[in-house]
Amino acid sequence: ANWNKSLALLLAGRLKEGFEQFEWRWRTKKTGMKAPAIDQPLWLGQFDLDGKTILVHHEQGMGDSIQFCRYIPLLYLQGARVVLMVPKPLVSLMQGLQGIDRVIEVGLPVPHFDCHIPMMSLPLAFQADLDNIPFSQGYLQVDPFKSQQWADRLGPRQRPRVGLVWNGGFRADRPDLWSTNARRNVDLHQMAQAFRKISVDFYSLQKGEPA
C-alpha cells in the first residue's frame, strides 16, 4: 500500500510526501528491489556533508539515472566530494555533470567514501518540490569532440532531428520487470506510420537486440 501511495502522490505532484513513501521500494516485494548492503551510513540530508566523500549509486533504469542526476551538483555545493557509480553506457555522459569528482562503472572497485545515497533518494534528501526541481534548463554537457563528430557524420540539418527509442532494456535477471517492460514498449512500425506526416528527421537511438 505504501509503495502504491508513493506513486499516486508523485503523480499528483505532491513530491515531498511522495518521495518519503518512495523509500518503501526497498521494503516491498512488488518492486523486486533490495537495499544495497553498504557499511557506510545512508545519507538522506540528516548530517553535514562538508569535507566528506559521498557515493551516489545507480538504481533501476538508465533513464532514471539521467533524470535524477540533476541533484548531484547540489551535493557538491554542500562541500561534498562526489563519487558516482553508474552502468558502463552512462560513464562517459555522466563525466560531463558538474560537481562530480569521479565516475566509476558498476562492478568496479569503489574508492573510499564516508556515506552513500541511492540515486532516486536524492529528491528526498533535498526535499524536492515542484518549485525547486534543480537545473530545469539542462544539466548534462555533451563532449564537444563527440558532438562535432556526429555533426560531421550527419551533415547539414534541413529539419528538426528527433531520436527514437521504442523498446526498454530487457533484463534476464529481473523477471519481475518483464511485464512492465512489455507494457511500455512500442512497435516501431506503428510509430513510423504515426510520424509520416511530421516534418522532422528521425534517428534510431535504440540499442541491443530490438534495434
Summary of predicted features, one role per range:
Residues 1-211:
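Alpha-helical solenoid repeat scaffolds of the TPR/TPR-like class and their adjacent stem/linker regions
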